[in-house]
Amino acid sequence: MLTLLNRWRSQPGGASNAAAFIRVLESPKSAVTDKVLVLKAFNDWDVLVNTWFEVADALPAVEQLLDNNTFPEHSSAALLVSKVYFCLEQYERALEFALRGDFNVVPATRTGLGNDAEYVNKIIETAIDTYKTLSKQGSGIPQKLRDLIDRIVARNLDKREIWFVISLGFETTNLAMIDRAISAMPADLTIKNQTTLVETLNRVVNGAFDRSFRFQVIDTVIKTYLKCPSPDMSKICECYVLTDNAEAAADTITSLIAKSLSTRAYQIAFDLYETASQGFLDRVLKRFQQQDARDEKSMEKIHSILKGHETVKAYLDFFVRHNHTDSVLMEEIKENIRTASAHNALLISNGLMQYGTTCDDFLRNNLNWVSKATNWNKFNAVASLGLIHHGQESSAMKVLEPYLPKESVEGFGFKEGGAMLAYGLIHAKHGDATAMSTLAQWLKTAENEPVRHGACLGFGVAGLGSSSVSNYEKVREVLQRDEAVSGESAGIAMGLIMAGHLNQEVFNELKQYTVDTQHDKTQRGIRTGLACAAFGLQGDAEPYIKEAIGAKSNPMLRSTGICMLSMAYAGTGSPDVVRRLLEKVATDPNLDVKRYATIGIGFVLSKDPSTCLSYVAMLTEHFNGHVRYGAAMALGIACAGTGNMEAIALIEPMISDKEGFVRKGALLSLALIMCQQTDYTCPKVNGFRKQLLKKIGEKNEDSLVKFGAIIAQGLLDIGGQNAAVTMQNSDKQPDMGSMVGMMCFLHGWFWHSMHFFIALAAKPSCLVMMNENLKIPVLDYICHANSQKFAYPPRAESKKDKDVKKIETVVLSITGKKNASKKLIAEEKKRREAAASASSAAAAPSSSSTSGTAPAAEDEKMEVDQPGKSKKEKAPEKDTKPLHRLQNPARVIPAQRQLISISDARAYSPMKPLYKGGIIVADRVDKEREEKLVSEVVTQVNTPASSGNTENKPHSTFEININDF
């Protein structure tokens, strides 16, 4: 048999016509040794390439040999079957028989690929794909497949291909594999390995993974990262925030202080305040109390930073100095207002525009107009002061004193309730013990619903994320009164306090109250509150979400479950969650469920606008108006502050939608997307601004649309045109304040006062550099771009300027004769001066022409402008310089950050890259050079009317007493 096989293989043209040898395999009378020889011959690729289609017909016979326990060459038979299936391109079957062959398959080299190498690599590829699929399905993985994957992993680790193993671990959510790969890194950690750790961290943070899996991977990364000779402690503390390990973060700061690295410790403290919740920061401060402070001076600064004093002061300085609110625009909108709803909208919009600026000129200059506010409009008028004076905590009581309750509440308490909400907004996300105690006392002594309503909302926004059980219980007492209006605010406030800390007890309590109460306002408030409490919990919130969504006969609970699902997975980009939301859009009959499910896609994909566009594009043309509204808002959330042109193109047609609430949603969404955009970054923005004014001024437009247009104008210019609405913090992670603020803003569908909460999502577009003493030094930044690309939008023209009629100048006949005569005289004088002195001739003509002819012409002309000449004279010169300078603290919008550098890099060494923005602490490089500091923040203010570099006195406190409301 062996001789025949050799002759057959060596014949001219290679082996062919294998029928005779195939009969050997099929015949039960053939000797076993002959069958073994034939199998080995066919396993040679030189033979199989020409005969595999013939062998394919005999596969049943070969498979019978595999089932025969007495056959000695199972591996040869299995290998042959596997190769034939490979030729048939049935790769899963090829893998199955390769594994049954019980032989070691390892990847072949990439050089000189032959048939065998192609086969082996395809089997490996199929094995990995199968392993991934089974892992995601949670199905059992065959032991032989596990063994093969283990061999692949071991081989890659031996070759130091660590990232391949980590990627495979992420795709299969195999923590042991990731741990094995990271542990295999050398103790001295090269730059490449440190980069791998950073990539691992970015992958686990930005990926759609289970919370427990994420925490375990981050813990592994931290342990390995600490082995570095000089680890990035800022990155490590970022990990501690993600894993909610406040004690470790405190220990890190303490160790840096002990090593005399106080500047770096200050930077970490600033970053913690920006990204961590109040509850986390409280635990950090408690940890400090348990430690012995060696450097008390530095620790005092750390305490001040973590309590928010330094950040609030720096941002207040920035907003006041750079306030660029367009007062003319506000007056123009006011002139077009004819209804109470539009009046209410402008009060809210003014608060947003002047957020943090302490500039209440519009209210003080229009007291008669403001006094027209009644009932809840009066509530909002006073509450807007909380936005205007946000951060002015030291003088909060002085600002609000005229409106706070005295011995007895005047009227129905709308003014007092608004003042309490304003007090909470001034302390938003920063409710210290004094502020919370004050609000708690007001909450306890409140005598009517508007006062309790304002006290609850103020209490909740000041204590956002504190997870204080005692504060939660104080608000619960209001909920148990079973009042509609105060019950709504109590439900929201309970969720704000427990934001990110939902537990079984809280869920059961609020769910049961939703079922028991007859007030739909209270039910809606609890829905928003539970959604806020579920923020960021991901898999930990699944039991509560499934229980709520599973309430088949209760649409309020189902919509609550949808909101919780959106917030629990906000920013994760989980495709499974998006599919669940889309399923509810398609199948649930309730309109609230459909609307919130569509909006939820924007929350989940808030870090991935392009993916959100692909999911939501078709929904913008859905037959159901609530779905269209939800699609618009989803795009606004996911693309907030980006100026995304694709999103704008999808939303623009909805401005003319037949449904008024869809048109309103489209305007709000576009305002979110175009916030802080310029013609350079988004060519549509100026046209949209004109469209808003047109909507506000149209007499036949729906009042709901006008309300939305006015609020949209406030969003466009939020923070004096110095802030942007964004869903991420400085570390590009989902921001609790932003997500919670947006969820509360969406509650504005039912209750107008909730529009104030969008300010929680407004982040200052600033770059503030501080020295080691936490003072702001005088220094310049260089922006490597034309100054007009990132400039403020042009101011609106006043009505007086628009109404001026420009008439062509009338030139009398005698004037023409005089001008001609004067022209001849001037030319003669010019020739004489040129002959006398060449140098003076260069200057004399222009002097004579301007001083000799122009005044005479003006005397004879009528005092009006020439349209053509006026435009030429008044047109500003365009700045064509390729770069420009900015002064610290500077306004730097997100699109501008990558283009910023310090003018004198030898002066300061920042603790983090400038493109991160926000507050950056820097070490002085040249300490012998004299350091100049920026003047005190509150004492000098640039008003919108100021010109040049002169600085005016600060605005006087808005202390009118609106007793005639």
Curated annotation (Swiss-Prot):
Keywords recorded for this protein, A-Z: Proteasome, Repeat
GO biological process: proteasome-mediated ubiquitin-dependent protein catabolic process; regulation of protein catabolic process
GO molecular function ontology, one term from the record: protein kinase C binding
Keyword Flavoprotein: no
Cited InterPro entries: 26S_Psome_Rpn2, ARM-like, ARM-type_fold, Proteasome/cyclosome_rpt, PSMD1_RPN2_N, RPN2_C
UniProt-annotated stretches for the region Disordered: 836-889, 943-965
Compositional bias (Basic and acidic residues): 863-882
Low complexity bias (residue ranges): 836-856
Domain of life: Eukaryota
Any single Gene Ontology cellular-component annotation: proteasome storage granule
PC repeat copies, ranges: 380-413, 418-452, 454-488, 489-523, 560-595, 630-664, 665-706, 708-738
The family this protein is said to belong to: Belongs to the proteasome subunit S1 family.
Its biological purpose: Acts as a regulatory subunit of the 26 proteasome which is involved in the ATP-dependent degradation of ubiquitinated proteins.
Protein name: 26S proteasome non-ATPase regulatory subunit 1
Taxonomy of the source species: Eukaryota, Metazoa, Ecdysozoa, Nematoda, Chromadorea
